[in-house]
């Protein structure tokens, strides 16, 4: 994943809207979980998950999970310390300096309902254009998009646009510009404009983040 992480807060968010883009339902199947809470169904696409849970209550609470206060890690290269640029450094953050590995967090939900997740992170410098993660809640992926969480990096021109010997404008190469960033987790497929939603029952849960790229 190659990033430093300060926090993963879950919070309620206003109802999301679908964009005008067409939905891909080719992988969609829904099966009832017999003998269990009928609210839970097996989901394969975020679109179907949204249809089931978007009408649920949205508690006015925030659940904070500081990046450095993880429950356990597996594989990868993890440490806790200070990270950032001069004037923009943060203390006591999780430093995930590898593309592989996973980190687990325990958290408690006081009120059942729909939540959104927001990450505060600093991308480490790598050749990858984005950071890709997979998210599990209680050991399961709630929908396919959760296995393809994408965090952007900040890119800037290496130098100003210039004119070559033939009078043509030349756009310079892009380089990564390190900075702390905060973003709600979004639908990587672009079918939904607003943050991804997660239905959480009251009680204790485990959040697992795994490095993909």
Give residue spans per PLM region.
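Extracytoplasmic
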Residues: 15-213
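Sec-dependent N-terminal signal peptides of Gram-positive bacterial secreted proteins and lipoproteins
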Residues: 1-13
């Amino acid at each position: 994943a190659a990033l430093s992480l300060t926090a993963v807060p879950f919070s309620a968010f206003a109802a999301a809207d679908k964009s005008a883009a067409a939905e891909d339902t080719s992988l969609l199947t829904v099966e009832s979980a017999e003998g269990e809470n009928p609210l839970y169904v097996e989901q394969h696409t975020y679109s179907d998950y949204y249809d089931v849970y978007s009408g649920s209550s949205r508690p006015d609470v925030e659940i904070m999970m500081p990046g450095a206060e993880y429950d356990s890690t597996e594989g990868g290269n993890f440490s806790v310390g200070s990270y950032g640029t001069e004037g923009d450094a943060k203390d006591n953050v999780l430093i995930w300096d590898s593309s592989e590995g996973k980190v687990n967090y325990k958290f408690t939900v006081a009120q059942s309902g729909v939540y959104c997740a927001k990450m505060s992170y600093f991308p480490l410098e790598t050749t990858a254009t984005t950071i890709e993660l997979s998210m599990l809640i209680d050991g399961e992926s709630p929908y396919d998009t959760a296995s393809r969480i994408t965090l952007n990096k900040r890119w800037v021109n290496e130098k100003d646009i210039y004119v070559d010997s033939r009078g043509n404008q030349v756009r310079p190469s892009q380089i990564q510009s390190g900075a702390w960033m905060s973003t709600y987790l979004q639908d990587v497929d672009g079918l939904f404009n607003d943050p991804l939603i997660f239905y959480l029952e009251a009680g204790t849960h485990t959040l697992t983040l795994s490095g993909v790229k």
